[in-house]
Curated annotation (Swiss-Prot):
Organism taxonomic ancestry: Bacteria, Pseudomonadati, Pseudomonadota, Alphaproteobacteria, Hyphomicrobiales
Protein family per UniProt: Belongs to the RbfA family.
SUPFAM superfamilies, per database record: Ribosome-binding factor A, RbfA
Transmembrane segments: none
Listed PROSITE patterns: RBFA
GO biological process, one term: maturation of SSU-rRNA
Its biological purpose: One of several proteins that assist in the late maturation steps of the functional core of the 30S ribosomal subunit. Associates with free 30S ribosomal subunits (but not with 30S subunits that are part of 70S ribosomes or polysomes). Required for efficient processing of 16S rRNA. May interact with the 5'-terminal helix region of 16S rRNA.
Gene: rbfA
The protein's name in its UniProt record: Ribosome-binding factor A
Organism: Methylobacterium sp. (strain 4-46)
GO molecular function: ribosomal small subunit binding
Cysteines engaged in disulfide bonds, as pairs: none
Length: 139
């Protein structure tokens, strides 16, 4: 029997449950089911949720649309964690409602950083030499 390793990714069940929880959180936030002035003023995206192996902890990566007011939004989500957990429990049929944690989604920042790197003069110079060779059918 194979032992799980540190590099092993989430199981198919973890991924499936994470997607259900993500949809439930996004639905609650988009419908405005939580009575919070900060949350009602922002459109919040939930691009990813990661589940613990025992499915008792869900880490939701969230970002207000436009990237504005991240700290107040995260604080509001933390304040409303219990109510949000109850709403998720109503929508997702699990033995235990997962405890919710909220983290800032950094994928957009990382993508922008990579884009800046690819557009840098040094990289363009390196790519320029390869593109000349690749574009020449006789080379």
């Amino acid at each position: 029997m194979r032992k799980p390793t540190e590099t092993a990714g989430p199981s198919q069940r973890q991924q499936r449950v994470a997607e259900l929880v993500r949809h439930a959180i996004a639905e609650v936030l988009s419908r405005g089911d939580l009575q919070d002035p900060v949350l009602s003023r922002h459109v919040i995206t939930v691009p990813e949720v990661r589940m613990s192996p025992d499915l008792k902890l869900a880490t939701a990566y969230v970002m207000p649309l436009g990237g504005q007011d991240e700290a107040p939004v995260l604080e509001a989500l933390e304040r409303n964690r219990k109510a949000l957990r109850q709403e998720v429990a109503r929508r997702v049929n699990l033995k235990f409602a997962p405890e919710l944690r909220f983290r800032r989604d950094e994928t957009f920042d990382e993508a922008a950083r990579i884009d800046r790197l690819l557009r840098s003069e040094k990289v363009q110079r390196d790519l320029g030499g390869e593109q000349d060779d690749a574009g020449d059918p006789d080379a």
